[in-house]
Swiss-Prot record:
UniProt keyword Glycoprotein, yes or no: yes
Impact reported for residue 464 to S: In allele CYP1A1*5
One MF annotation (Gene Ontology) recorded for this entry: iron ion binding
Catalytic activity reported: an organic molecule + reduced [NADPH--hemoprotein reductase] + O2 = an alcohol + oxidized [NADPH--hemoprotein reductase] + H2O + H(+); estrone + reduced [NADPH--hemoprotein reductase] + O2 = 2-hydroxyestrone + oxidized [NADPH--hemoprotein reductase] + H2O + H(+); estrone + reduced [NADPH--hemoprotein reductase] + O2 = 4-hydroxyestrone + oxidized [NADPH--hemoprotein reductase] + H2O + H(+); estrone + reduced [NADPH--hemoprotein reductase] + O2 = 6alpha-hydroxyestrone + oxidized [NADPH--hemoprotein reductase] + H2O + H(+)
Cofactor (UniProt): heme
Induction (free text): By 2,3,7,8-tetrachlorodibenzo-p-dioxin (TCDD).
Gene name tied to this protein: CYP1A1
Name this protein carries in UniProt: Cytochrome P450 1A1
Enzyme Commission numbers on file: 1.14.14.1, 4.2.1.152
Key words of the record: Cytoplasm, Endoplasmic reticulum, Fatty acid metabolism, Glycoprotein, Heme, Iron, Lipid biosynthesis, Lipid metabolism, Lyase, Membrane, Metal-binding, Microsome, Mitochondrion, Mitochondrion inner membrane, Monooxygenase, Oxidoreductase, Steroid biosynthesis
Membrane-crossing segments per the record: none
Entry keyword Kinase: no
Function recorded in the entry: A cytochrome P450 monooxygenase involved in the metabolism of various endogenous substrates, including fatty acids, steroid hormones and vitamins. Mechanistically, uses molecular oxygen inserting one oxygen atom into a substrate, and reducing the second into a water molecule, with two electrons provided by NADPH via cytochrome P450 reductase (NADPH--hemoprotein reductase). Catalyzes the hydroxylation of carbon-hydrogen bonds.
Subunit relationships: Interacts with cytosolic chaperones HSP70 and HSP90; this interaction is required for initial targeting to mitochondria. Interacts (via mitochondrial targeting signal) with TOMM40 (via N-terminus); this interaction is required for translocation across the mitochondrial outer membrane.
């Protein structure tokens, strides 16, 4: 039954005025689209929450499906915040490379302000000349203590020396586990080995596999990726920050612990610093700070706090991405014994057993390289880049994108795009090999995992080298497996870097 609602002419007029005023404010707050351009298309969203429910637990999958309907440039809302989503290799390359200056910003998201007190080189909204100079400084330090050769060592570079040492320790540790409980969770031990490599580069030291302080930090890292992954509702709906949120609280605690750890390491370096005797990246940054050197393009001086932030960025990026890549690789190896055997046959043919693999062997091991590429592509363990934002009003593919617009870059979609890949859901390293057995360079460049353009991961080259060398040394010496009947869960868990479920049933034996 319907009940009539009585309304006087005055009340009706007042309601109409309020409605028109609200409508006008909403329209006025929306940027005016220049002639010849149009707004990016997108689905209808719910009031207040926008498309938050549509994104679900796997935003990369939801947005990939959405791109099939609306195209490579689409727009959604999370809360009341508009977000442009980019898909498609050509579109993303156009935005991040050819129009790199337009898309090099970072959105001012709440969770980003919790990282390094809001001064993180990777997450800070700053994208100006000072940021660029600090990024170059970090790149140079990383290069000097990883790719550069160590005159006191027989290895080709510092990175090779550190990885070779840690891979041997890892094998010994796994042997002890096989002699004891007879099984292990590989992630638990790989993460310490990889962390020791970046610790050697940044701090000139390593840790035991049972070092409690280090374990407490690296084991909390999964929460970091869960919170800062693209689409966190707390970044777009402010009220959620004040409601009970265990993940967000753990994230705050993790960042405080990481910062305190880095602060302690930098202080120790200050106490033992010797001019002319630079031991690692932290020393090189302290030297820069003390000499108050000026960058050639920007007047950049480093405070003690900035040193901590740069080292924290390098440390965080240096262990999480590589650990995740190696961990996924081991999962694919036990799921595909045929592939593991082919890699080992190639290692035996090219290198043999009399010496350890070296970085210089990489170009002679195409099947190994194809396996790594397929692991990157199939897992797409970095589904989105860290969110970008536009630094000025711009357009892309005929669509208008105003300054300050948050931009999600869907790397998962590229790596599973049926226009680029035959049977993308199938794990097939051979897809990257030419008929004569070499790496297909054109196809390999279509795998996107480290971003593109001006915000591309500064450690990409080192990460690729490190993953290769760890796997080559391990697979030359040992064989990985799981017991018959054990089901391995390969379902990715969404985050900034997607992890797989914990697998405690790994086994290892030395190759005969």
């Amino acid at each position: 039954m319907l009940f009539p609602i009585s309304m006087s002419a005055t009340e009706f007029l007042l309601a109409s005025v309020i409605f028109c005023l609200v409508f006008w404010v909403i329209r006025a707050s929306r940027p005016q689209v220049p002639k010849g351009l149009k707004n990016p298309p997108g689905p209808w969203g719910w009031p207040l929450i926008g498309h938050m429910l549509t994104l679900g637990k796997n935003p990369h999958l939801a947005l990939s499906r959405m791109s099939q309907q609306y195209g490579d440039v689409l727009q959604i809302r999370i809360g009341s915040t508009p977000v442009v989503v980019l898909s498609g290799l050509d579109t993303i390359r156009q935005a991040l490379v050819r129009q790199g200056d337009d898309f090099k910003g970072r959105p001012d998201l709440y969770t980003f302000t919790l990282i390094s007190n809001g001064q993180s080189m990777s997450f800070s909204p700053d994208s100006g000349p000072v940021w660029a100079a600090r990024r170059r400084l970090a790149q140079n330090g990383l290069k000097s203590f990883s790719i550069a050769s160590d005159p006191a060592s027989s290895t080709s570079c510092y990175l090779e020396e550190h990885v070779s040492k840690e891979a041997e320790v890892l094998i010994s540790t796994l042997q002890e586990l096989m002699a004891g409980p007879g099984h292990f969770n590989p992630y638990r031990y790989v993460v310490v080995s990889v962390t020791n490599v970046i610790c050697a580069i940044c701090f000139g030291r390593r840790y035991d596999h049972n070092h409690q302080e280090l374990l407490s930090l690296v084991n909390l890292n999964n929460n970091f990726g869960e919170v800062v992954g693209s689409g966190n509702p707390a970044d777009f709906i402010p009220i959620l920050r004040y409601l009970p949120n265990p993940s967000l609280n753990a994230f705050k605690d993790l960042n405080e612990k990481f910062y305190s750890f880095m602060q302690k390491m930098v202080k120790e370096h200050y106490k033992t610093f010797e001019k002319g005797h630079i031991r690692d990246i932290t020393d090189s940054l302290i030297e820069h700070c003390q000499e108050k050197q000026l960058d050639e393009n920007a007047n950049v001086q480093l405070s003690d706090e900035k040193i901590i932030n740069i080292v924290l960025d390098l440390f965080g990026a240096g262990f999480d991405t590589v650990t995740t890549a190696i961990s996924w690789s081991l999962m694919y190896l036990v799921m595909n014994p045929r592939v593991q055997r082919k890699i080992q046959e190639e290692l035996d043919t090219v290198i043999g057993r009399s010496r350890r693999p070296r970085l210089s062997d990489r170009s002679h091991l195409p099947y190994m390289e194809a396996f790594i590429l397929e692991t990157f592509r199939h897992s797409s363990f970095v589904p989105f880049t860290i969110p970008h934002s536009t630094t000025r009003d711009t357009s892309l593919k005929g669509f208008y994108i105003p300054k300050g617009r948050c931009v999600f870059v869907n790397q998962w979609q590229i790596n599973h795009d049926q226009k680029l890949w035959v049977n993308p859901s199938e794990f097939l390293p051979e897809r990257f090999l030419t008929p004569d057995g070499a790496i297909d360079k054109v196809l390999s460049e279509k795998v996107i995992i480290f971003g593109m353009g001006k915000r591309k991961c500064i450690g990409e080259t080192i990460a690729r080298w490190e993953v290769f060398l760890f796997l080559a040394i391990l697979l030359q010496r040992v064989e990985f497996s799981v017991p018959l009947g054990v089901k391995v869960d390969m379902t990715p868990i969404y985050g900034l870097t997607m992890k797989h479920a914990c697998c405690e049933h790994f086994q290892m034996q030395l190759r005969s």
